From Swiss-Prot:
Biased composition (Low complexity): 1123-1136
Biased composition (Basic and acidic residues): 344-354, 592-601, 985-1011
GO biological process: DNA repair; DNA replication checkpoint signaling; meiotic cell cycle; replication fork arrest
Annotated segments matching region Disordered: 328-354, 564-601, 901-1021, 1041-1251
Organism: Chaetomium globosum (strain ATCC 6205 / CBS 148.51 / DSM 1962 / NBRC 6347 / NRRL 1970) (Soil fungus)
Metal-binding listed as a keyword: no
Subunit composition and interactions: Component of the fork protection complex (FPC) consisting of TOF1 and CSM3.
Major location category of this protein: nucleus
Skewed-composition ranges (Acidic residues): 576-591, 1069-1079, 1103-1122, 1157-1179
Role: Forms a fork protection complex (FPC) with CSM3 and which is required for chromosome segregation during meiosis and DNA damage repair. FPC coordinates leading and lagging strand synthesis and moves with the replication fork. FPC stabilizes replication forks in a configuration that is recognized by replication checkpoint sensors.
Name by which UniProt lists this protein: Topoisomerase 1-associated factor 1
Localization per Swiss-Prot or TrEMBL: Nucleus
């Protein structure tokens, strides 16, 4: 009955019965044969039933009952391994045995799956089964990796080999699942480890890391991992994190620094470690013997201790007789007050790392071989692919994979450095050694993408308080810095250049500096691993940054902080408080330029200022906490802490941060305490000097600053530390900014402007400012009038000849001295600096400020300049008086203050230090021009480059116009007309400059492709010139054959002459398929129903360079020219070009459009032509053909695939009348290579423009 009760408590009896019957039906050992394992009749179905039980009962109900029953029935060891061994021994077995083996794996994978303890989801069943299943998994691992009958791991891989041989794109979902199943099986075997809270009864060496590595090597599992890792991204994609998981559980907690050392060196290291451990044990025994009980301790001891106050305290125990320190410690322990204990926190150490792993020599060599091969072939592909999976947050990526990724990056980087060091020490420079000497093997974790991923994860882990992930990222960051440092000191010029580039990018972001300082400053109780990682990163980062900043004195850092400050609240009530508060609020962002300039100056890196970030008490406390483990720290860790304290106390002059009782006591105990540092340590002498110098400086400072006696008990803030160090408060210099500048919303007369400002001051109850201004102006007016009267009297008394002899300059130089505006109170002085309305009124009445805006201070002097006459001052006073008695009234109930607005400063992009000299570069490019419409970018290459172009407004000032046309019925005011005309001209000039800039940007890349093209001796240029002049000669010969003859020559028939003239001049009537357009080059395509626009806009834009052969026609037919222009405007404005019927050849006339460069602007205004559309067509890199031989260059953007070109150059589907008139003897121009479009001599006139 008790057994039944026990069964009911652990596993449901019905489930146990089903599982037991299935296991019995699977098979067993026969007695008739050789004693081997014999499968049951329905073994495959039994295995599938067992898989369904595991899957649908355990996993869905979350009970673990089936796994418990299978563990008790010893299914894996007694059945499944034997079945898989039968498949191996029988090589010629059928497909049936392969299915059997695969079904066995489908059961073993969930049985060996890692069991995680989750206090939130664990039930009573979990607490019952978990210890048993953990021990059962250890048994599975021992049986699998030590199975003598057959190699189980290689058998599992053999199942997946056919699936791996299939290309990645051809694999089915079953193939992918098979590969993942095998990899998960290998992961599970590598991951199973003895549970920390349970005692394993078997031999732990059979499940140790050394045994696992030996099994992986013997069964070629390492070769499988290398194959998959090296082909990651090509043949394998979603298996990346599984391979990462396997490698992680193979190398975790293995000391990579000892992996590549020689055997002799390794023995020496182990001897030193043993000696240090024995020495430490002797010191502990010596300390214990001081307090060890004697044979008289059974009698007991009780003593009285007399204190300074005369009170007596009772202390019991024989150890109270040793010394005063022990007695005080016992009295403290007997005190009734106990500080409250915190709740026990979760262990902060990295998850699943466990204790340090010690490998035997055989396993160490096997792992060394695997790591070397992995670094040579699989490191870059695997970690590059995993990083991309982490960045895109792939569905198969878990949170634990982030920690594993950064842990392995750090581990392999350290292993690579140790391998290089071992190869260097061995002096064995073979070909393999040369390959090892290259840092290309780990290049995928030293690129910018990796740094971005690392910085983002570092910031995210710190913000989310994921201390385990943050610890691994800090370890990774440290190893990357050490690797880059080794690259910089490798002696290879290429490696040094790469290292310099990497360091400049790492140190460029100031957010990284801030994050590291915050991490080490905010340490609390995250565990020793976190403490060790953050102090190591801080030490390495600061040390490398200091060395780099000394070599690069112009190091720049970028801060993403904005200097715009938040609006300040009004500090006090009342008129003065409102005035100042309004000034501050108005002045919030008015001085953006100065603030940006200040930020730019602060971005220049200063290592001394950067080092002060590690001086606060929080950072000191972190290193003090780390130093408290001095008995367990090695020499490198002790050196790390020593260097920090030494720099803080003696290089940064912040020794007062160490003047705290617990710190002084720690330093003293490290040297003279009961458990001091080992004197044989290499760091003992340095720590002794540091402790002595620190205590000596503390004593000396106590004599200088008696207040330090109190401050010894507390931590120091920055201001307190500064006072204790220098004896005075830290001086803070404030730079107040003047009030924001205001402007009027509408353009009004000066009288109305003064009235508005007077009304504002009256509404704000600040009439005292008006009285003060009027008094100052009145005194200045009296003084100025007296001076003017005196000057008139002197001029009247002076003879006429002396007056004539005086020069105009001397007379003009006689101006009165300026009058200084003197504020009567401090409030007035503040208002002159902070009140924007008063400042605007002072400017309107003519006052001037001596200091510029950037240098203005509250003590800046305002003056009444000597150029203001007494009458002007009197008029200003009268305007103020008038506005006081009759304030202005506005519509819709608006106030006078509503007529003003803040003067907006032009927005500027964030300026960084590397952009400070941008203006000088633009001045160089723009030839020193400073144009408002240039937007600071300038022309992207010098004008007059490889392409011939017209001169623009940037090259020379526009010509003056002799006549100015005015609108009918317009104003006769010449000033208004001039302003309007100038505005239009400026708008047109700005549009031209904009188009030039766009063109320059589009062809900049082509222009600077090959600098040899600027050389006239370059073969490419010679070839283009030769083709160009050949085409010119051919065209000139054609023109001479027609235009050079005034009449039909003798011997030539009339019909032949008309046919020749019609063929040559056929392009003038607008036919698409004939004329010179068809001969010289192809026309831009017609897309859909849209027609190509007229080329007159191109002429107006290009400046109208005249044609040599068209000059005489222009002189004789000016009227026809005008008609030609007017006729061309209509189709251009309509945006289409209709086809026209062909006219008889003898009735055609050659018409040339002549547009002079001087009338460029007028043509652009008067003609209704879409200039921007033609500019866009120019930007698409095709040149429209014309009679002077310009060639069309079709591009993928400009060519139409549906267009067909007919013989003779005809294209399109327009009316093709008179095809027999085509001139078949005219030479066809060869197309120019599309290396760079050039505009040569001649002018461009399209056939449609000749109508």
């Amino acid at each position: 009955m008790e057994d039944v009760g026990v069964n009911n408590d652990t596993v449901h009896p019905e489930a146990r019965a089903y599982i037991t019957s299935l296991v019995s039906a699977l098979g067993g050992y026969g007695v008739d044969d050789d004693g081997g394992y014999t499968l049951g009749d329905d073994a495959l179905e039994v295995l599938r039933d067992l898989k369904r039980w595991v899957r649908f009962y355990d996993e869905r109900t979350n009970r673990m009952d089936v796994a418990r029953c299978l563990a008790e029935s010893n299914l894996v060891t007694s059945d499944l391994l034997q079945i898989m061994a039968k498949w191996v021994s029988n090589e010629s077995s059928s497909k049936y045995m392969e299915r059997i083996a695969f079904a066995c794996l489908e059961i073993m994978v969930p049985l060996t799956w890692p069991i995680e303890r989750d206090s939130e989801t664990m039930t009573v069943n979990h607490h019952r089964h978990l210890p048993v299943l953990q021990l059962a998994q250890l048994g599975y691992k021992r049986a699998i990796i030590n199975f003598d009958v057959a190699p189980i791991l290689s058998t599992a891989v053999r199942i997946a080999l056919p699936c791996m041989a299939i290309p990645n794109g051809d694999r089915s979902s079953r193939d992918q699942a098979t590969i993942k199943l095998i990899l998960y099986f290998l992961r599970n075997i590598a991951m199973i480890a003895p549970p920390p809270g349970l005692k394993y009864e078997g031999d732990e060496t059979q499940v140790s890391r050394s045994t696992l590595i030996d099994a992986f090597t013997f069964q070629d599992i390492f070769l499988t991992i290398l194959t998959i890792a090296s082909n990651m991204g090509e043949d394998f994609r979603t298996e990346d994190v599984i391979i990462l998981d396997i490698i992680f559980h193979i190398v975790k907690r293995v000391d990579s620094s000892k992996l590549f050392v020689s055997e002799k060196r390794l023995h020496k290291i182990k001897e030193d470690e043993l000696t240090a451990a024995m020495r430490k044990e002797a010191a502990m025994l010596k300390s214990y013997n001081k307090n060890a009980p004697t044979r008289h301790s059974r009698f007991g001891t009780m003593i009285w201790v007399k204190r300074e106050s005369g009170k007596l305290a009772t202390v019991s125990g024989q150890d109270a007789l040793l010394d005063a320190a022990t007695r005080e410690r016992k009295m403290d322990s007997n005190k009734s007050f106990k500080p409250p204990r915190r709740a026990r926190k979760e262990d902060m150490e990295p998850k699943d790392l466990g204790p340090r792993v010690s490998l035997d020599e055989r396993a160490r060599r096997q792992l060394q071989s695997f790591v070397s091969e992995f670094l040579d072939s699989g490191f870059n592909p695997l970690f590059s692919h995993v990083r991309r999976s982490l960045d895109r947050e792939a569905p198969h990526v878990l949170q634990s994979h982030h920690s594993q990724f950064f842990y392995l990056v750090a581990w392999f980087l350290e292993a690579e450095r140790m391998r290089k060091k071992a190869a260097k020490d061995s002096k064995n420079q073979t070909s393999t050694g040369e390959d090892v000497g290259s840092f290309n093997l780990v290049a995928e974790v030293l690129n910018q993408e990796m740094f971005i991923t690392m910085s983002r994860t570092l910031d995210r882990a710190y913000g989310d308080k994921d201390w385990r992930l943050l610890t691994t990222v800090m370890r990774c960051f440290t190893q990357i810095l050490l690797t880059i440092q080794e690259m910089a000191s490798s002696g290879n010029e290429e490696n040094e250049e790469i290292a310099d580039n990497i360091l400049s990018r790492l140190f460029y972001e100031e957010t990284t500096h801030d994050l590291i300082a915050n991490i080490v400053r905010t340490y609390k109780d995250q565990g020793f691993e976190y403490l060790d990682a953050c102090t190591e990163l801080t030490h390495t980062f600061v040390r490398i940054l200091e060395a780099y900043s000394k070599e690069n004195v112009d190091l720049q850092v970028r801060s993403r902080k904005r200097t715009r400050r938040k609006k300040k609240a009004a500090k006090a009530a009342g008129d003065q408080g409102d005035d100042e508060g309004q000034g501050d609020a108005e002045d919030d962002s008015a001085d953006d330029e100065r603030q940006a300039e200040k930020t730019s100056q602060e971005r220049k890196f200063d290592f001394k200022r950067f080092a002060l970030r590690f001086a606060p008490q929080g950072v000191v406390d972190t290193f003090v906490t780390f130093t408290k483990y001095y008995r367990d720290l090695d020499d490198s860790q002790l050196k790390r802490a020593h260097r920090y304290f030494f720099k803080l106390a003696f290089k940064q002059d912040m020794s007062v941060m160490l003047f705290r009782l617990d710190i002084i006591h720690l330093f003293y105990n490290m040297i003279k305490g009961p458990e001091p540092l080992d004197k044989s340590s290499s760091m003992y002498k340095e720590w002794e000097d540091l402790a002595m110098q620190t205590i000596r400086k503390c004593v000396k400072k106590l004599e200088e600053r008696p207040a330090l006696f109190t401050e010894l008990l507390f931590s120091k803030i920055t201001s307190t530390a500064h006072y204790l160090e220098y004896g005075h408060e830290k001086q803070t210099i404030s730079n107040p900014r003047p009030a924001a500048e205001l402007e009027f919303k509408r353009e009004v007369e000066r009288e109305q402007q003064i009235a508005i400002l007077v009304g504002v001051l009256i509404d704000r109850s600040q009439t005292d400012h008006l009285g003060w201004i009027k008094k100052q102006l009145s005194d200045a007016e009296s003084e100025r009038r007296a001076w003017e009267n005196a000057e008139r009297a002197l001029a009247a008394e002076r003879p006429d000849d002396e007056v004539m002899a005086g020069s105009a300059e001397a007379i003009a130089a006689k101006t009165p001295d300026h009058v200084t505006m003197r504020p009567d109170t401090d409030a007035r002085r503040t208002a002159m600096f902070k009140n924007p309305h008063l400042r605007l009124l002072m400017k309107l009445v003519g006052l001037e400020r001596l200091a510029p805006t950037l240098d203005e201070t509250p003590d800046a002097i305002w003056i009444i300049p000597g150029t203001l006459t007494a009458d002007a001052l009197k008029e200003t006073i009268s305007l103020i008086n008038k506005a006081e008695f009759t304030p202005p009234i506005f519509d819709d109930g608006e106030l006078a203050e509503d007529q003003l607005r803040r003067k907006t400063a032009p927005r500027k992009r964030a300026a960084y230090d590397d952009d400070d000299n941008l203006d000088g570069i633009n001045d160089l490019i723009n030839d020193g021009s400073d144009d408002d419409g240039d937007d600071g970018t300038g022309i992207l290459f010098p004008a007059g480059g490889p392409t011939a172009r017209k001169r623009t407004a940037q090259d020379e000032p526009p010509k003056k116009r002799l006549q100015r046309r005015r609108r009918r019925g317009g104003s006769d005011d010449p000033d208004a007309d001039t302003a309007e005309t100038d505005a239009q001209a400026e708008a047109r000039a700005r549009a031209r400059r904009k188009k030039e800039l766009e063109k320059a940007r589009k062809i900049k890349s082509e222009m600077y492709v090959d600098p040899r093209e600027d050389d006239s001796d370059y073969e490419g240029n010679k070839e283009r010139d030769r083709l160009f002049f050949a085409r010119e000669e051919e065209r000139q010969a054609v023109k001479d054959a027609t235009f050079g003859l005034s009449s039909r020559p003798e011997g030539v028939g009339e019909g032949a002459w008309e046919a020749l003239v019609g063929a040559v001049m056929g392009g003038g009537d607008g036919d698409d398929g004939e004329g010179e357009d068809a001969v010289v080059g192809e026309r831009p395509p017609k897309v859909g129903g849209r027609k190509r626009k007229s080329g007159v806009a191109d002429l107006a834009e290009s400046g109208g360079e005249d044609s040599e052969e068209g000059d005489e026609d222009d002189e004789s037919r000016s009227e026809e020219d005008g008609s030609a222009v007017s006729e061309a405007e209509a189709p251009a404005a309509a945006g289409r070009r209709p086809n026209k019927r062909r006219k008889p050849a003898q009735k055609k006339k050659k018409r040339v459009v002549d547009i002079s460069s001087g009338e460029d602007d007028d043509v652009g205004m008067d003609m209704d032509v879409d200039v921007d559309a033609d500019a866009d067509a120019d930007a698409m890199d095709f040149t429209q053909s014309s009679k002077d031989g310009a060639v069309t260059n079709d591009t993928p953007l400009s060519s139409d695939p549906s267009r067909t070109t007919k013989p003779g150059g005809a294209e399109g589907s327009g009316d093709k009348g008179g095809g027999e008139d085509e001139d078949e003897d005219m030479p066809v121009a060869k197309p120019v290579a599309r290396a760079r479009p050039r505009a040569r001599a001649g002018f461009i006139v399209e056939s449609s423009d000749e109508e």
